[in-house]
Amino acid sequence: MPLQTVLTQRLGLSHPIIQAPMAGGATTVDLVAAVCEAGALGFIGAAYLTPPQIADVSRALRARTARPFGINLFAPLPAPETPRDAAPALERVAPYHAELGLPPPTLPASTGDPFREQLAAALESGASVFSFTFGILPAGAIEAIKARGMFLIGTATTVEEARALEAAGVDAVVAQGSEAGAHRGTFAADFEAAMIGTMALVPQVADAVPVPVIASGGIMDGRGIAAALALGASAAQMGTAFLTCDEAGIPDAHKAAILGAREHETRLTRAFSGRPARGIVNRFMREVEGPGAPGAILPYPLQNVLTRPLRTAAAKQGRAEFLSLWAGQGVRMARRQSAADLVARLATEAEAVVRRVAASA
């Protein structure tokens, strides 16, 4: 019997499974549509998309599925100050540009935050769910999202952040444990202090806020989903598990790295974007953050813009040592399969665990 929770009932899902909204190309229309059609909640990771791209992707997705889907943006952040001396950052990346046949790197310009325009496009996307990370949305944005009848989800890495999100008006909170791959959602605490594991974080957040909680971080199979529900979550959000699906839009070199990695081979890094994110350790991470490279990382999002040409070229050339190999600590459990097969397997496994535990009680 399918597992049902307050969240599955509210969102019209068959399973308490959410495909994480991974920005940067992973969440293709094929992936999101397959996840939704399988009865889970698929997400468009739209943080790096332009408004026209958001419109195009949403239109294509609506043509593929009539089931609920979500869209995700980064909360607007203050514009970073360009360092007076950015030479160390440019000098650190320059040899890699030469190695991949790229022109010398240039200092990225401080660009305006695209959130306002992205939000306008997201409101017209047809998504049933809107989620965000990196902070709290402006009150006007929350009002606009609610006016469209969209279910609103924020991301927390501490109880205090969860309480702040609930007070701002979110309908549910993602409790992102330290095991999670990619960027940390921390916004109201020191990054290191907010490195709380999923098993410890989820029940504390569930006790602290009255809205549904979504567990995230290191969950890769039905055992993790069942555990999340037992801890008080209403669903499990999974990213790394979906990155190795056939439909995921990451480079083959990234998929191969995930499938060959072990749990001790990921760590937090600022090397690629300037903001702490968990990925599989590679040459770029080791060398850019090495002891001989002080001051070689620009603040987010400048570092992200600086390294983008390198990452793009590396993807085309199959050079995993220069890719941001985002992955969580559950990486050893990753499998290569279709998104539909993954959702079906996760649901079957979770239901079996719940039955087994109930039978032994």
Regions found by a protein language model. Name each.
Residues A94, H183-A188, E192-I214, I219-A361:
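Conserved active-site-proximal phosphate/metal-binding subdomains
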Residues M1-A208, L346:
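Active-site entrance/lid segments in N-terminal catalytic domains of soluble metabolic enzymes
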